[in-house]
Amino acid sequence: MILFKPCSTFDVAYNIYKFDSELRKLIITELEKIEVAVRTQTAYILSSQWDGDWFTDTFHFNNSVRHARILSKIDEEYQLSDEEFVKAFKFKYSDPFLPSWITMEMSSLDTLSILYNNLLPGRVKWSIAAYFGLPDTVFASWLHSIVYIRNIYIIWKLNLLVIFFLA
């Protein structure tokens, strides 16, 4: 037996659905802009301060065990990627890792967040956060929150697809 709240109507339910849909579109559009900026600034600042494979050097990171896990995750994302630029790199080069500017584009936002949090404190980490007008600790927290919100959106979308598929 399905119960409805008193005074509920199809119009009320539809208006809530429309509002929810528009809010989700707005949030994901803005999150995508932030994601592109984070990828770009991370690749640009770190590659200009160090070199193209800086992310492979344990010297730049707080925790070597966490760094090894990050490299493993990057390698997993590299092996599973179906991006054309990744396929072209694999075809042309035998390097185990892509240059950082390609790696930052290919990696998940979650991986980038973990990578940023594991960077040694200092000028480079501060420079990335400063681009966004934030102290590095606040930026790290916001980046983690953005990953969380984005994951909620993705899970919601996947659940919606499953519901429609099963219906």
Where are the predicted features?
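Long, contiguous internal "core" modules enriched in hydrophobic/ aromatic residues
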Residues: 1-167
